[in-house]
């Protein structure tokens, strides 16, 4: 039997040069799993706690030796002798060992590393791909990539307030063609920006981070790049935005301060602006359009746009079934962003996806801005037949690692692989 004989964690670096946790799980059969934990820049108020050491003389306070020690000294002894294929039991033990609502005792970064490494070791023992281990033999849907090609907000040092402007190749016949389309548009955008004398350096997630005249100019420029690459905006390629508006929401006056444009908007005015942008550009998805605590604003946005635009809750739902249940009950949003480190275990992640689907919400599997070479989320996207993945531009190895893993999976699935394109938005009037 694949009993666990050792669980070992170490401190490694993520794509931003900040420390993160890597965990290795060893079994008596020789089956082995390794996982690296991602980290976010714009984080939701209700996310599970990422444990940092706080020692300013070491990695500017961002060290994770406390989380590493929690794995090696507290979690590891408790898992010895466990059957590594008992994912639910392992995750439940991790939750109980921590004993807090937000995983603040052991750290979500410690717990998640163990949860993912155990899943990899189990797949290794069974000699099947990770996506198949996690999702079974019906796991065959390749996701539509949501590719962040213009970065702003917390992800870039520029004057753009909206954090992410993305493209979605919904008209592609399969995943590899979708990736090709995205890559060609990315290169086309580079030449468009260059011709305008704009900066073509990339941000945390591989997208470009130019200074633009307005947030709308980002949409205009992307449409120009899509056409220059030879594709039809709206028909073959849709646009998506992640406003991450909690980052520019002012709690004191309850308004949205778009400092890049020098304007201040109320919730209703933000909704008006989104409605105007949707009428002018082929936008199919808006994430965190309003502050995570502005439930009235989110409800208004859902009433106005929820039938024709995917309204994704990231900071709003933080991959948490309690927050999602509240959203479903109040008619807020129609989609959830899934980030494994927001909740801390694979079991809880899959519970959130299941709840979303039962309620008719879509689920978008997502990276974080601080990523690694770990490609687990690619397997999760296929395992859950989620239909969408958000993992940055086709640039930077930490982003491309996920796309390359999806190419491998599509190859393995061969003629059984499915790519639903526009039909991934099954709850919209398309």
UniProtKB/Swiss-Prot annotation:
Alphabetized GO MF terms: magnesium ion binding; phosphopyruvate hydratase activity
Catalytic activity entry: (2R)-2-phosphoglycerate = phosphoenolpyruvate + H2O
UniProt cofactor note: Binds a second Mg(2+) ion via substrate during catalysis.
Signal peptide: none
EC number, as in UniProt: 4.2.1.11
Localization per Swiss-Prot or TrEMBL: Cytoplasm; Secreted; Cell surface
Pathway in which the depicted protein is active: Carbohydrate degradation; glycolysis; pyruvate from D-glyceraldehyde 3-phosphate: step 4/5
Chaperone as UniProt keyword: no
Annotated active site: 205, 339
InterPro entries: Enolase, Enolase-like_C_sf, Enolase-like_N, Enolase_C, Enolase_CS, Enolase_N
Cross-referenced PROSITE patterns: ENOLASE (PS00164)
Binding site for (2R)-2-phosphoglycerate: 163, 339, 368-369, 390
Cofactors that this protein relies on: Mg(2+)
Annotated positions binding Mg(2+): 242, 287, 314
SMART domains xref list: Enolase_C, Enolase_N
UniProt keyword annotations, A-Z: Cytoplasm, Glycolysis, Lyase, Magnesium, Metal-binding, Secreted
Cellular component terms (Gene Ontology): cell surface; extracellular region; phosphopyruvate hydratase complex
Alphabetized NCBIfam families for the sequence: eno
Protein name: Enolase
């Amino acid at each position: 039997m694949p009993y666990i004989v050792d669980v070992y964690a170490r401190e490694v670096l993520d794509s931003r040069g900040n420390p993160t946790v890597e965990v290795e799980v060893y079994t008596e059969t020789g089956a082995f799993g390794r996982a690296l934990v991602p980290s976010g820049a714009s984080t939701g108020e209700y996310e599970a706690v990422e444990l940092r050491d706080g020692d300013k003389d070491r990695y500017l306070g961002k060290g994770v030796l406390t989380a590493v020690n929690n794995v090696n000294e507290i979690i590891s002894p408790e898992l010895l002798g466990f059957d590594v294929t008992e994912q639910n039991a392992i995750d439940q033990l991790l939750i109980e060992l921590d004993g807090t609502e937000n995983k603040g005792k052991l750290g979500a970064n410690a717990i998640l590393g163990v949860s993912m490494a155990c899943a990899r070791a189990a797949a290794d023992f069974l000699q099947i791909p990770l996506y198949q281990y996690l999702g079974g033999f019906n796991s065959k849907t390749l996701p539509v990539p949501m590719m962040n090609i213009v970065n702003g907000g917390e992800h870039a040092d520029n004057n753009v307030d909206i954090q992410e402007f993305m493209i979605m190749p919904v008209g592609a016949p399969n995943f590899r063609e979708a990736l090709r389309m995205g890559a060609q548009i990315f290169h086309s955008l580079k030449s468009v920006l260059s011709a305008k004398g704009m900066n073509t350096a990339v941000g945390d997630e591989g997208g470009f981070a130019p200074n633009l005249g307005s947030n709308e100019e980002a949409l205009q420029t992307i449409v120009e790049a899509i056409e220059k690459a030879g594709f039809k905006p709206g028909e073959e390629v849709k646009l998506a935005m992640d406003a991450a508006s909690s980052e520019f929401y002012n709690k004191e006056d309850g308004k949205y301060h778009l400092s890049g444009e020098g304007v201040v908007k109320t919730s209703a005015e933000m909704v008006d602006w989104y409605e105007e942008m949707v009428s002018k550009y082929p936008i199919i998805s808006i994430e965190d359009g309003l502050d995570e605590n502005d439930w009235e604003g989110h409800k208004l946005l859902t009433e106005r746009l929820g039938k024709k635009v995917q309204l994704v809750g990231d900071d709003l739902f933080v991959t948490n079934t309690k927050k999602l249940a509240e959203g479903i009950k109040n008619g807020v949003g129609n989609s959830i962003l899934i980030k494994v480190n927001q909740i801390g275990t694979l079991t809880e992640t899959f519970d959130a996806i299941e709840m979303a689907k039962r309620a008719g919400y879509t689920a978008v599997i997502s990276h974080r801005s601080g990523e690694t070479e770990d490609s687990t989320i690619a397997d999760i996207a296929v395992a859950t037949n989620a239909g969408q993945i958000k993992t940055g531009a086709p640039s930077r190895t930490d982003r491309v690692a996920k796309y390359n893993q999806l190419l491998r999976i599509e190859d393995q699935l061969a003629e059984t692989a499915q790519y639903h394109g526009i039909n991934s938005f099954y709850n919209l009037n398309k």
